[in-house]
Amino acid sequence: MKEVILNQEQMDLLKDHAVKCGSNESCAMLLGIHNEQQWNVKEVFLTRNADGDSEITFTIPPEELLYGYQLADEKHLELVGIFHSHPNSIAVPSNTDKKFMKLNGDIPWIIFSGINTDFKAYILDEDIEEIPIKIKERHFFQ
């Protein structure tokens, strides 16, 4: 079964980032390990939103995007997810999200709703498919 795996500390970090951004969309790169059915997040790289004070769009600044990929490479990880928030709506991909999901291939998008304070994950297969988020226990000796 397809799933995104995060620990509670990572979920809290993403939620705090979204809350700090208030009514503007927040964004982050999720780095980790991917096999055919699982995207296992090992590191969260919080980014700024280059769209500034936008409630409805996000763009990761090019220099932060590049740094995120370099960080993944240094740690022998890969991009396993793109996170952003919908401060004033539910956690469902917008038409803009769907367009950019097509450009990002087999990478889940994790969306946080500022209304419901919940997370949902989506992958583009033949169509947009919601996939479960599994919360794992954090082991300090991984």
Language model: regions and residue ranges:
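Short, well-ordered beta-to-alpha junction loops that form the rim of enzyme active sites
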Residues: 85
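Conserved beta-strand-loop surface patch within small alpha/beta domains used
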Residues: 1-79, 88-142
